[in-house]
């Protein structure tokens, strides 16, 4: 997507490194503490990759990202929960805006929620994103809920999310 001149924005708690050390999007130079965003350094890149560690306020950050996705529909805007169950802190945003805004106000939004879930050694509460709650909110094609099984699935899901001609929230 970056090589096709699309912008990508990711925010959430510890997203630069990834809670499970799965991303390493920002590297620090040991001597100078300079931060290097590798995805903005590769040749042929046209778009901008912005990644921001956020404060521990899911409600505020998801609200900001929802507004950002609304104001900048040409940017793939992603909010990642540090653990899947952390979406609880933003439940009002999910209920009132993410799942219902198109029906209520006839506005579309393409915000992507990444909700890590699985047994990562952090205990039962952190191990479930409670996807069943998102499935219960699905009605009249108001959002997409997906559980990818391969990296290729994930790539094509994000690509489709950004390249289609309408916007709908995506929960992964």
State the predicted function of each range.
Residues 1-74, 81-102:
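Non-catalytic terminal/interface segments that mediate subunit docking, oligomerization
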Residues 76, 81-172:
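Phosphate/diphosphate-binding loops
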